[in-house]
From Swiss-Prot:
Its EC number is 2.7.6.1. This is Ribose-phosphate pyrophosphokinase. Mg(2+) 1 binds at H134. Belongs to the ribose-phosphate pyrophosphokinase family. Class I subfamily. Its main location: cytoplasm. Homohexamer. One of its GO terms (cellular component) is ribose phosphate diphosphokinase complex. Pathway: Metabolic intermediate biosynthesis; 5-phospho-alpha-D-ribose 1-diphosphate biosynthesis; 5-phospho-alpha-D-ribose 1-diphosphate from D-ribose 5-phosphate (route I): step 1/1. ATP binds at D41, G42, E43, R100, Q101. SMART domains: Pribosyltran_N (SM01400).
């Protein structure tokens, strides 16, 4: 890519500095110099170590766990760049936290996804670049441009290269009714049929498998979802598929939130491999043999380059 180092700057908070470094490398520019830490009382401290006057600034920060710290880091960084006279301030949020609170599910619930959008705008963001929002309509919560990239083409490419396209024994499985559209588009890229798991969720983070619609016996099954949190849904689905005679079970998602018992559940499940995008950093350590992480840095860098050059991003939105 053309070197825009005089006018474009990539900065990062503490949520995912490795991804920010990958994006900067793909753009052939150095990562911007900033110190983001905390004062002794826990307040967040931001110190920009280079001039950004008139520059296009891109702040890479997923609002994953610890969600509130990462969100406040992002807001304070946006404010710092605004007061440092940055030309345009772009919030690059690979994983947008609070996206599941996008509506009033019951009386007196907040709509926190809208609140976060308002906070980002009030802080001074001029644009948001994100990937696979849990609810696509969150784009409408903003009064600034939102570029919404899709992760499924990256995941589909991985399975095509793995030799799982154009085969009679492969089926793409939606883990719930809400993911059917995603599963269908994903299946089209593999030229595979789909199956659907009808589940009932008695309470938050608890799922129960009810029925599987479609033929999975002696099939290689690929489960796809936008995110995996406590992994109850995906592991229950995988075990149910195996019980019904599935030959192999793979799973994939854009966002590996992986909170609570997720790692234990996945390692003890019928899932042979879980493929995720690195919108959230995968923790280091043992017990990760089933986990595969694919980088979103190339598509993020391409999007950033197009934003800087005022070129259309429509070619990146194709699912």
């Amino acid at each position: 890519m053309e070197n825009h180092s005089k006018n474009i700057k990539i900065f990062t908070g503490n949520s995912h500095p490795e991804l920010a470094r990958e994006i900067a490398k793909a753009l052939n520019i150095p990562l911007g110099k900033a110190e983001v830490g905390t004062f002794s009382d826990g307040e967040i401290s931001v110190n920009i170590k280079e001039t950004v006057r008139g520059c296009d600034v891109f702040i890479v920060q997923s609002t994953c766990s610890p969600v509130n710290n990462n969100l406040m880091e992002l807001l304070i960084m946006i404010d710092a760049f605004k007061r440092a006279s940055a030309g345009r301030i772009n919030a690059v949020i690979p994983y947008y936290g609070y996206a599941r609170q996008d509506r009033k599910a019951k009386s007196r619930d907040p709509i926190t996804a809208k609140l976060v959008a308002d906070l980002l705008t009030a802080a001074g963001a001029d644009r948001v670049l994100t990937m696979d929002l849990h609810a696509a309509q969150i784009q409408g919560y903003f009064n600034i441009p939102v570029d919404h990239l899709l992760g499924s083409p990256i995941l589909a490419k991985y399975f095509v290269e793995k030799g799982l396209a154009d085969r009679d024994d492969v089926v793409v499985v939606s883990p719930d009714l809400g993911s059917v559209t995603r599963a269908r588009k994903f299946a089209d890229k593999l030229n595979a049929p789909i199956a659907i798991i009808d589940k009932r969720r008695p309470k938050a983070n608890v799922s129960e498998i009810m029925n599987i619609i479609g033929d999975v016996k002696d099939k290689v099954c690929i489960l796809i979802d936008d995110m995996i949190d406590t992994a109850g849904t995906i592991t229950n689905a995988a075990n149910a598929l195996k019980d019904l005679g599935a030959k192999n079970v793979y799973a994939c998602c854009t966002h590996g939130v992986l909170s609570g018992p997720a790692f234990e559940r996945i390692n003890n499940s019928a899932i042979e491999e879980l493929v995720m995008l690195n919108t959230i950093a995968l923790p280091e350590g043992e017990g990760l043999n089933k986990f595969k992480s694919l980088s979103v840095a190339p598509i993020m860098a391409d999007a950033i380059n197009r934003i800087y050059d005022d070129e259309p991003l429509s070619g990146l939105f194709q699912d």
